[in-house]
Amino acid sequence: MTNNMAKNLDEIMEEHIPNLASDLYKTCNDLLRLQMSGGTGNLYFVVPGQGVEYAGSNDRNIRGYIVRWDLYKQIGMPEIKNDEDYVNVIAQMVEAAGGVTKSGSTLYGMGISGTSLGDWYARGRYIAEAGTRPTFEGYLYEASVKDGTLLNGYTDMDHSAFWVDMRFYNDMYNAGLLDPDSFTMTGSELGEKVKAGTYVASRTRDNNLYNVNVLEDVNTLEGYVMIPSEGAVMHADFLTPCGYAPGDYTFLSASSDNWEAAAKVINFYHDPDVSRLIYSGIQGTHWDYDADGVPQLKDEVFQKATELGYGSEAFFKETGIWGGYWELTPWCETGSHPDGYFYSLFQEQTNRAKALNAMDKDFATTYGFATPSAYHVSLIDSGKITTLVGERGLLVTMGITDIPLDVQRIMTNCNDILFQYVAELVTAESDEEFNAIAAQCQTDLADAGEADAWQWCSEAYAKSFEVVNPIFEELQAEYLAHPAGRP
């Protein structure tokens, strides 16, 4: 905007992007004008993922304590309250499987593609001890999911996704449960190992394991599930009134000779029926309205979802239903269509049980519920589980547009320092050695000027927080009064 690269959408909206002028987008557009206009009050961006992500959780919830369901059942489903319990459960599953895969190779507890710093703390964000979300994207100043308080993930070692994960991976390594290839493995290499059944647990729910096994046995229980725990943050009820901004956004180039064609594309995607199309398929082919005006998926679509897995590559190839958002999809799955139902009809509570695969159905019935998400909701609404309903860090950082270069350099240097210590921390042979390495890391961070970067970022965050927090709390109160996605 400083260089006049982005076109002012307010000037062309009525004629060229009329769908964006709909009241459906008023909250988002007003927030973008407030937080991402460079002080002009104009609209320059469109964003994906608006609504409430994972309203009422999700039957394939991807974050938290992830285990291989068949083995977890085999060892008696012990409770997982914290990372210590998790490591013990992982060890029991490896032992129950005899320590080897079907092909006879070594069975590990977990592996990650650890070629960047972010790989080594993505899991830790969803452990309640930290409970943070990406805020200053790519850096360790992250907001608490509970109340939006900015936490210093470099130095506050008790509330840092990085330090939580360093302790966890150190415990895993010393127990012989962490794949040593984790330090050098690429994402594609990890994916192949997951498909081969190399791990009994996963940093996130990786459906590749199940998707491979279900092709051989439609009733397989060999796949990953998330075990709800008071020690983890559940990825549910995530209010995204401004989508995934400021990390994800689209703008029209002010210098383009073809901006009108680009505006047509944006207008097309902001037709709410297009988001329904992306998540639920073609009206008349995959779903239609019944006599009461309720959108209903067709039985054959449920059958394919059950057999192949909604959102899987096989399901997409068979039905043409993508089942996921991309950068120009304005709404998330559990955003509300003007007809009053979710954009993804698969996420309606009346439909969730119909679309379950055999493994997820077995998980739900084992715990006495119709769906995994119904089990999750019972814990959420009874106050036993922390969710993302308090996350507002994204809205706050939307208003922080110009981080000084010297501050960016300090934070980048701090990231480099942390990454340099990862291998030493993970492979430390004792608590004493781990603590000594951590102390030296803290000294290096201090010498790099981390305190100066923290001062600037915390002050900028506080200023933006003051502006946007009252708006968020009003939206939060409205949602909590009538939470969506409940049985």
What are these regions, as identified by a protein language model?
Residues M1-P487:
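Extracytoplasmic/secretory soluble proteins
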